[in-house]
Each structure stands twice: as structure tokens, then as C-alpha cells.
């Protein structure tokens, strides 16, 4: 069970190839192609969100894939946090 005061961010939340119904929570323009758990973790650390990695977790809509998730501090809306993480990953990727 997750802690109170934490947001759950899945790689699927930032994945450009997914639909909104499939789990993406930010616009396609802001989203990423195939985000990795380690990228999410590094970006969250850079943003001082105190990420906790849960690599063995499976996204409910794709329960057959083990994508993992991160728990970050709940300082603002989940979509805002997701946009900041995606922007940081894009900068790290060089784009």
C-alpha cells in the first residue's frame, strides 16, 4: 500500500504511443517515446521529488508487462508533475 502524500507515476503516463484511455495523462506534444523507469527516476531526483522506485509493479491496464512505477512527493497536481518529469527527460535525451 502506498504512502499518503505520494503520487504514483507510471512510464505509461508519459508514453506518447498510448492513448488517454490507455494511461497517458499529458498531451502527446509533452509526452515521450518509450520512457524508461530509470529515466523517470533520474528526472524525479533532479526535480527533488524524492522518488521511491517500485520496479516489480505492473501497470493495471497492461498487467502482463512489468514496467515498474515511482512514487514521488505530492507537491502539486499529478499532470503538472508528469509534465515536469517529461520535460526533464526530454532535456536529458537532448531534445
From Swiss-Prot:
A GO BP annotation: SRP-dependent cotranslational protein targeting to membrane, signal sequence recognition
Subcellular location: Cytoplasm
Superkingdom, natural source: Archaea
A cellular component term, taken from the record's GO annotations: signal recognition particle
One Gene Ontology term of the molecular function aspect: 7S RNA binding
Pfam families tied to this protein: SRP19 (PF01922)
Keywords annotated in UniProt: Cytoplasm, Ribonucleoprotein, RNA-binding, Signal recognition particle
Record SUPFAM superfamilies: SRP19
Assembly, per entry: Part of the signal recognition particle protein translocation system, which is composed of SRP and FtsY. Archaeal SRP consists of a 7S RNA molecule of 300 nucleotides and two protein subunits: SRP54 and SRP19.
Its biological purpose: Involved in targeting and insertion of nascent membrane proteins into the cytoplasmic membrane. Binds directly to 7S RNA and mediates binding of the 54 kDa subunit of the SRP.
Similarity comment: Belongs to the SRP19 family.
NCBIfam families, per the entry: PRK00754.1
Name of the molecule in the record: Signal recognition particle 19 kDa protein
Organism in which the protein naturally occurs: Methanococcoides burtonii (strain DSM 6242 / NBRC 107633 / OCM 468 / ACE-M)
Classification lineage: Archaea, Methanobacteriati, Methanobacteriota, Stenosarchaea group, Methanomicrobia
Amino acid at each position: 500500500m502506498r504512502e499518503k502524500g505520494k503520487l504514483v507515476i507510471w512510464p505509461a503516463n508519459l508514453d506518447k504511443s498510448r492513448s488517454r484511455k490507455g494511461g497517458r495523462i499529458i498531451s502527446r506534444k509533452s509526452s515521450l517515446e518509450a520512457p524508461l523507469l530509470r529515466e523517470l527516476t533520474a528526472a524525479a531526483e533532479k526535480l527533488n521529488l524524492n522518488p521511491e522506485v517500485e520496479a516489480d509493479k505492473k501497470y493495471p491496464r497492461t498487467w502482463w508487462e512489468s514496467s515498474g512505477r515511482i512514487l514521488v512527493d505530492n507537491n502539486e497536481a499529478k499532470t503538472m508533475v508528469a509534465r515536469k518529469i517529461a520535460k526533464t527527460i526530454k532535456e536529458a535525451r537532448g531534445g
